[in-house]
Structure formats: structure tokens, C-alpha cells
């Protein structure tokens, strides 16, 4: 999920609330369920019209790549009783190859490149935003990929539906940072999700995470480093402030007490997307994490 597009700011808060209200009203008028009620989500759902090219991609490729596991029209929840198990994986992908799940696949650049490079591995892209799903459909369809599927699903619900040992790897690259202190509970990396991912991973399976936000890197360490059942495989030593500073206060972090943390070399299975290029051009440091199930 590319956070430069999806992160709310103070100036957009009123507009965001209006859009959310409009979405609920629109869903009710169409007979569709309003999404999620009071659940804490890692994203803000905004309706976005597809341009002609993306609409054609959706119409052409959705039946091939988009999983039909949603609770209903317009819902990002998993339908009641759905189980993501080996039988479903075998039926959907047509084989029992290892499965890699990317949370927040954005425009699909990374997951499509990975699927094309590794035809003996199955891939599932999780993305909630219509344009991102449509663009991933377009890229996958152009290459006629057989080993990729897409689910427009709230990621934590998919992992709750997954059976033990069904997934080889999970990727979460550049998630929405939710920089305001009061929004940290919306960050996708949370203990509850980590527990579900741990259960769903195969033995020695890994969760790969990357962020270009220093404060989010600290958050990842706080959530993941002391969890039973995960080992931080990082071999690099990185110095980070040990306190959160919140949105707009990044300059204050340099004066805070720092500590050393273990992080990984850049994952060579991640393509250099336009989003990552922008972060590097802005002088941001990329933090990579590899947490292995033990």
C-alpha cells in the first residue's frame, strides 16, 4: 500500500470524513452493506472511478485473477464460513506450490514482477483500492500469468481465515505509516495480525517488511522483536530513536536517545518501484525486516 497516496493529513481530515459519510450513504442507497462499522482499519476506503484503460482491464481480467471470497457486493470482508486452506489453494492455483501473500500490493509492480520471475511459486496480492487492483489486473493479464491471484480483501480477515501452515511467505512493503500518534493503532503491523500470520506460515516461513519511515521502523521492532515464535534474521545494525515523535516532528528524533536494532539487507526479491525510488530521492532510508517463524 503506497502511503503517499493513502495517508490522511490534517488539511484533508474534513474532506476525508465527508467522503466516508458519502460512501456509507451511497452503499445504503445501492443496497450494499456499509463497510466495517467501528473496526480499526489500516486504510481509508475512498471510492475512485477507473479510467477507461483500467476499466477495460477489470472487465477483461477480473474473472481470471480476482478471487470471489468477499462477504458481499462492496464488502472488503471475507464471506462467512470461508476457509483458506490447501484444498482451496489447490483448486484456485491448480497446484500445491508454495504461496507468497503480499499485503497492500499497490499498483502491482512488485508482485507481478515476482510472479513472472518465479513461475514455480504461487502469489496472492491483497489490495483494497480499486485503481490498484485494476492496474495489477492489467499487468498480470498482459503477461498471461498463471500463478498470480488478487483478493480485494481487508488483509487481517484473510489471515484469520487461513489454516495453519498454508502460506510460505508474507510481504508487507511500504505500508501506510499513519504518522499521527493517535493513528498508530491503524498501522497494519500489529500483535494480533502477527499472531495470525505466525499461525498461517509454514515452518521456517517468513514475514518480510519494508518501510522508508524511521518512526514506523521503530514500531515494527516494538511489535515484532519480542514476539514468541518469530526470529529477527537481520544481520545489519541500525540506530533508531527509542521514542515516537509523531507527525511533523521528525527533526526532533535526532536529539532523542538512540539504540541499536537488527535489520536486514534490502530484499533482492523486491523490484525497485517508482514509489521506492521517490523515497530514496527524498533522502529517506529504507528499513528491511525479515522475521522467520520458529
Curated annotation (Swiss-Prot):
Query: Record keywords: Cell division included?
Result: no
Q: Which InterPro entries match?
A: SAM-dependent_MTases_sf, tRNA_(Gua-N-7)_MeTrfase_Trmb, tRNA_methyltr_TrmB_bact
Q: Which residues bind S-adenosyl-L-methionine?
A: 102, 127, 154, 176
Which reactions are catalysed by this chain? Answer: guanosine(46) in tRNA + S-adenosyl-L-methionine = N(7)-methylguanosine(46) in tRNA + S-adenosyl-L-homocysteine
Entry EC no(s): 2.1.1.33
What pathway does the annotation place this protein in?
Answer: tRNA modification; N(7)-methylguanine-tRNA biosynthesis
Please give one Gene Ontology molecular function term for this protein.
tRNA (guanine(46)-N7)-methyltransferase activity
- Cross-referenced PANTHER family, in alphabetical order? 3-DEOXY-D-MANNO-OCTULOSONIC-ACID TRANSFERASE/TRNA GUANINE-N 7 - -METHYLTRANSFERASE, PENTACOTRIPEPTIDE-REPEAT REGION OF PRORP DOMAIN-CONTAINING PROTEIN
Membership in a protein family: Belongs to the class I-like SAM-binding methyltransferase superfamily. TrmB family.
Q: What is the protein name for this chain?
A: tRNA (guanine-N(7)-)-methyltransferase
Gene responsible for this protein: trmB
Amino acid at each position: 500500500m503506497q502511503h503517499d497516496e493513502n495517508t490522511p493529513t490534517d488539511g484533508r481530515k474534513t474532506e476525508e470524513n465527508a467522503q466516508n459519510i458519502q460512501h456509507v450513504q451511497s452503499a445504503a442507497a445501492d443496497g450494499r452493506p456499509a463497510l466495517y462499522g467501528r473496526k480499526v482499519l489500516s486504510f481509508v476506503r475512498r471510492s475512485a472511478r477507473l479510467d477507461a484503460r483500467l476499466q477495460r482491464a477489470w472487465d477483461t481480467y477480473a474473472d481470471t485473477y480476482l478471487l470471489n471470497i468477499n462477504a458481499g457486493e462492496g464488502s472488503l470482508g471475507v464471506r462467512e464460513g470461508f476457509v483458506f486452506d490447501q484444498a482451496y489453494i489447490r483448486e484456485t492455483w491448480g497446484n500445491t506450490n508454495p504461496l507468497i501473500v503480499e499485503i497492500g500490493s499497490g499498483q502491482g509492480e512488485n508482485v507481478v514482477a515476482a510472479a513472472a520471475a518465479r513461475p514455480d511459486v504461487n502469489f496472492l496480492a491483497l489490495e483494497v483500492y480499486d485503481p490498484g487492483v485494476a492496474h495489477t489486473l492489467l499487468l498480470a493479464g498482459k503477461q498471461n500469468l498463471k500463478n498470480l491471484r488478487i483478493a480485494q480483501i481487508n488483509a487481517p480477515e484473510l489471515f484469520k481465515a487461513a489454516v495453519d501452515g498454508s502460506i510460505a511467505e508474507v510481504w508487507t512493503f511500504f505500508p501506510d505509516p499513519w504518522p499521527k500518534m493517535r493513528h498508530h493503532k491503524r498501522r497494519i503491523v500489529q500483535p494480533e495480525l502477527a499472531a495470525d500470520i505466525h499461525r498461517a506460515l509454514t515452518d521456517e516461513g517468513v514475514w518480510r517488511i519494508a518501510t522508508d519511515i524511521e518512526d514506523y521502523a521503530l514500531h515494527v521492532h516494538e511489535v515484532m522483536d519480542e514476539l514468541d515464535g518469530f526470529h529477527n534474521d537481520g544481520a545489519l545494525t541500525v540506530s533508531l530513536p527509542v521514542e515516537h515523535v509523531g507527525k511533523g516532528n521528525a527533526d526532533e528524533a535526532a536529539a532523542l536517545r538512540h539504540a541499536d536494532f537488527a535489520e536486514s539487507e534490502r530484499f533482492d526479491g523486491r523490484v525497485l518501484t517508482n514509489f521506492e525510488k521517490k523515497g530514496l530521492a527524498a533522502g529517506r532510508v529504507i528499513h528491511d525486516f525479515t522475521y522467520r517463524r520458529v
